[in-house]
A protein has these predicted regions:
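Short helix-initiation/N-cap motifs at beta->coil->alpha
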Residues: 15-16, 30-42, 97-99, 113-127, ...
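Flexible hinge/capping segments at coil-to-helix
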Residues: 76-94
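Extracytoplasmic small-molecule ligand-binding "clamshell" domains
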Residues: 1-54
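Extended ligand-binding regions for polar small-molecule ligands
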Residues: 15-24, 96-100, 163-203
Length: 207
């Protein structure tokens, strides 16, 4: 969804979407980066005004912050492992801390092994700490493809969450309305779908 390019700037799908939303909402926006595990507390405390970071809209997060309408459809999550017969129900499954996937694993009966970053969850499978990783399928596809057959998808895809939206403070109703209008206009004119396909390929889910 986003990454730092060689120049140290925020780049990727969300950079393009964010810049376009700010232009349509007539807002002057400055990009900052933050660690995932403190991203919501630092929003509520006022360090920045919105989160655009691949954050799924969930009931749990809605208790603390507000979300815009989604700018990315509910994505499939998936399991990947070193073998097709990995134990997903009774084994050890790695997931990123404080994600919708971690919550799902915790309730699935498997033993949840949490890591701060996606890369660490994959490493846990590769080094034998975990039997499988459970993550956004969009993130896992290139990982599995580039593993040279070392990693495979296991079981069925699992649709989770209400899609990805902008995280906002509950008090910022005016800002939320501006972003909602801008997102809707990008959905209506097809520009959002174009960006989804540009960054995630022809097979990606669109609006």
């Amino acid at each position: 969804y986003n990454f730092l390019n060689d120049a140290g700037e925020v780049d990727g799908f969300e950079r393009e979407v964010g810049d376009e939303l700010c232009a349509r909402a007539e807002l002057t926006c400055e990009w900052v980066t933050n660690e995932w595990d403190s991203i919501i507390p630092n929003l509520t405390s006022g360090n920045y005004d919105t989160i655009i970071a691949g954050m799924s809209i969930t009931d749990e997060r809605e208790e603390v912050i507000d979300f815009s309408q989604n700018y990315f459809p509910p994505a499939a999550s998936a399991y990947a492992a070193k073998s097709a017969d990995a134990d997903l129900k009774g084994g050890i499954v790695a997931a990123q801390t404080s994600t919708i996937q971690a919550g799902y694993v915790a309730e699935s009966g498997a033993t949840l092994l949490e890591f701060a970053t996606y890369d660490e969850t994959v490493a846990a499978v590769n080094n034998g700490e975990a039997d499988a990783v459970f993550a956004d399928k969009d993130a896992l596809v290139p990982t599995v493809e580039e593993s040279g057959g070392e990693m495979v998808f296991v079981g069925d895809d699992v649709p989770l969450g209400g899609g990805i939206g902008l995280g906002l403070r509950e008090s910022d109703t005016e800002l939320k309305a501006k972003f909602d209008t801008a997102i809707q206009s990008m959905k209506d004119d097809g520009s959002l779908n174009k960006l989804i396909i540009k960054w995630f390929g022809e097979g990606a889910k669109t609006f």
